[in-house]
Amino acid sequence: MPRKTPIERYRNIGISAHIDAGKTTTTERILFYTGVSHKIGEVHDGAATMDWMEQEQERGITITSAATTAFWKGMAGNYPEHRINIIDTPGHVDFTIEVERSMRVLDGACMVYDSVGGVQPQSETVWRQANKYKVPRIAFVNKMDRVGADFFRVQRQIGERLKGVAVPIQIPVGAEEHFQGVVDLVKMKAIVWDDESQGVKFTYEDIPANLVELAHEWREKMVEAAAEASEELLEKYLTDHNSLTEDEIKAALRKRTIANEIVPMLCGSAFKNKGVQAMLDAVIDYLPSPADVPAILGHDLDDKEAERHPSDDEPFSALAFKIMTDPFVGQLIFFRVYSGVVESGDTLLNATKDKKERLGRILQMHANERKEIKEVRAGDIAAAVGLKEATTGDTLCDPGKPIILEKMEFPEPVISQAVEPKTKADQEKMGLALNRLAQEDPSFRVQTDEESGQTIISGMGELHLEIIVDRMKREFGVEATVGKPQVAYRETVRTVAEDVEGKFVKQSGGRGQYGHAVIKLEPNPGKGYEFLDEIKGGVIPREFIPAVNKGIEETLKSGVLAGYPVVDVKVHLTFGSYHDVDSNENAFRMAGSMAFKEAMRRAKPVLLEPMMAVEVETPEDFMGNVMGDLSSRRGIVQGMEDIAGGGGKLVRAEVPLAEMFGYSTSLRSATQGRATYTMEFKHYAETPSNVSEAVINAKQIGRG
């Protein structure tokens, strides 16, 4: 079956933003204007099409990124039909993992900013993730009708805070309640949207007299940015500033956007139906198609480098980037096709797990509505039914031409809670529910505490775990009670311990056990665990060296201070001995474990705690209360700035997670409910000795 839309007319984009910047409303408008969704879903009344989990509708935040396909022929109907696959991404910091995994499969992103709040903490996180995956982006400054709206301030913030080069291709006509439309700096015309038709109709008009000078000033900056795309254009521009044609400007801006050198910037009010269609045109004009993106890299089963180009003629390759449980069809695996073609019924290789599976039905999603399709091709995003083995980050490919694409990395959880079902009868059901949810979300973990037998759930923040417990009740009918949140401490060492030996000897008639290992242990900040084999002269036979490493790895799970996982240590295996008859893998595993425990005791072990980046927005009158409260929580204030439009102060601080439980309640009472805050995990830092002692004692009492 031939391709309906040429790959050059595909756009795989994400819409990402800080919570409350109006991202879901923007996505809803896109679905409306592209004719997919006939009634605009409003977040205010809990009817948004994209926010399809019940909790999202209640909380008014987007949790799971749903993938949606829409078609667009341009605002004025002057483009050939383009296919836009939109991945909706959450803006709450507890769901950063969702943003991370969608960035991995996108070709371009539209960053939505609040015209008043501007660049907020989550905007910085999302920007970093887009940089990491080299995702070209455009910026849409939303809510231009709000009091305090300031398009140009957001433009400056993108430069100052995000180090991005934002190039306005529009400027607003009016602001706050006088916001009417935009000036298109490429065409040098004003665009005014008609309220009666919900913005479907619009007119091009002359630029209002009071904006002509400003429009010329910003057009000049835009054309200059475009001219830097090539020597020829620059020369042409320097000869005559007005010599670049509309097509030349667009092509040059596109080239520089795809190279991640600039970020074209637009504005509007999605809620007031202004500016969204022009943003869709910009998606087509400036963001890449799958064909504009470099070939994706991976390696074959022999670890040789391999690549796949975005073409139907290449062998099939795809990445599973999300798993969801659907009440009607069971497990859905969302995947992005990088190359080749696959039909329902074909056999695929899951190269990551080296298992073959038959592809059942293929569904294309529109939020939570679905359409069954026969095949998918390079550049498509779809959902598969019937893949039992696939999990997030797995590569699916042609069994005859295997490739493993680069895996996704997921952060370690920072908070955990004990959880138990309200009725004993639900124990098994709870286990199944938690395992299913952990399969869907790689940043959520479930384990059993070996000492207490309790089920422990871990995640990226309090809201993350709240929603897991909530989903367990709604989707699986299991009500659970949760314990107090516990901080995920870590242990590491401060100094070097050399020549530490571990000897495991059991010789009591018959075959004995003998393992002897000597190690050096040193700090390895920020690099995790490393094991170096420095054995010379065969004092430990080759086949037993992995056993020493295994023994140490098992011991890393529980440190010597308080039984927390050990991180950032480097172990050198330097010496040892063996017995011809009695040595075996188990003996060397035990020797490695004993040596490591002893070395850790000697190397000044310390406790590490997660530090959170906290930002508080508060009216100025309560500034003292907020600062005092943060200091009492061992917080270090790192900066303050005015919120534009007389909106109070923004305080940035770094605070230990252990001190942040219950913060929202105390912030409310300290500021009469007028302050808001966000926090996200920053890094691990050494715990002060008095806190460390308290944590260790509490752990020992718990064990005792």
Swiss-Prot record:
SMART domains in alphabetical order: EFG_C (SM00838), EFG_IV (SM00889)
One annotated GO biological process: ribosome disassembly
Pfam families, sorted: EFG_C, EFG_III, EFG_IV, GTP_EFTU, GTP_EFTU_D2
Location (main, coarse): cytoplasm
Gene3D superfamilies: 3.30.230.10, 3.30.70.240, Elongation Factor G (Translational Gtpase), domain 3 (3.30.70.870), P-loop containing nucleotide triphosphate hydrolases (3.40.50.300), Translation factors (2.40.30.10)
Keywords: Cytoplasm, Elongation factor, GTP-binding, Nucleotide-binding, Protein biosynthesis
CDD domains given in the database record: EF-G (cd01886), EFG_III (cd16262), EFG_mtEFG1_IV (cd01434), EFG_mtEFG_C (cd03713), EFG_mtEFG_II (cd04088)
Signal sequence, renumbered to the chain: none
List of residues binding GTP: 17-24, 88-92, 142-145
Single annotated GO MF: GTPase activity
Keyword Protein biosynthesis included in the entry's annotation: yes
Domain tr-type G: 8-291
Subcellular location: Cytoplasm
GO cellular component, one term: cytoplasm
InterPro entries, per the entry: EFG_II, EFG_III, EFG_III/V, EFG_IV, EFG_V, EFG_V-like, EFTu-like_2, G_TR_CS
Functional description taken from the UniProt entry: Catalyzes the GTP-dependent ribosomal translocation step during translation elongation. During this step, the ribosome changes from the pre-translocational (PRE) to the post-translocational (POST) state as the newly formed A-site-bound peptidyl-tRNA and P-site-bound deacylated tRNA move to the P and E sites, respectively. Catalyzes the coordinated movement of the two tRNA molecules, the mRNA and conformational changes in the ribosome.
Family: Belongs to the TRAFAC class translation factor GTPase superfamily. Classic translation factor GTPase family. EF-G/EF-2 subfamily.
Record protein name field: Elongation factor G 1
Species this protein is from: Burkholderia pseudomallei (strain 1710b)
